[in-house]
Amino acid sequence: MANEACPCPCDIGDKFEYGAKGQEIQIEHIKAYVSKPHSSTDKAVIVVQDIFGWQLPNTRFMADLLTAHGYITICPDFFVGQESWKPSNDWSTFTEWLQTRQATKVEKEMNVVLKYLKEQCHVKKIGVIGFCWGGVVTHHLMLKYPELKAGVSFYGIIRDVEDRYNLLNPTLFIFAEIDHVIPLEQVSLLEQKLKVHSKVDFQIKVFPKQTHGFVHRKKEDINPEDKPFIEEARKDMLEWLQKYIN
């Protein structure tokens, strides 16, 4: 569990024991996990990791879930070979560690991923989802890349960028009620500002009694009381992507 010395409660939750269905590939200077459906498609979703990195089984489970619904999915190593965070690390060093992995400086890698999807996979419609650190990345990308048809940000929010409310395409923000990193006051402010500034569709949804990471870091069979919320959030993600990536 997170404690007062822990600036990010991402260690709350479970690491899935999961055998991924896709494969790891090299795309120019970055590695990526890619999962493809049996039938051909021109739709893809970029899945952005949390602080535990692109190889976390939980994240690959979510990528494969999307693939099962007909999308090519790709989970790139946005840390570009830098070590991911480990629950056993000293949390007092987290802020320093994070400074070398800034969620708003991923354009170089993003451009490589988009080129791969368009040229190698013949994709025409692209969305993005992300968790925690990746949720911040998703928020950032939805401000910068008009070709991203839809975004789903899980428990991630940009706090310090002036134009963070000018979304380019529809974005769903999913938060947990009990999240010490993202207090509900910040969620309310985001919603108020988006109502004023956003010219595209958006939705903000807060799930009661849930903690940071609940959509991809909790196991339904271990936490049966959380199962309806986990399933609902995943359903919301799928419906949002289906609505706007068509």
From Swiss-Prot:
Pfam families: DLH. Its EC number is 3.1.-.-. This is Carboxymethylenebutenolidase homolog. It is found in: Cytoplasm, Cytosol. The active site is at C132, D179, H212. Belongs to the dienelactone hydrolase family. SUPFAM superfamilies: alpha/beta-Hydrolases (SSF53474). Keywords: Cytoplasm, Hydrolase. It comes from Xenopus laevis.
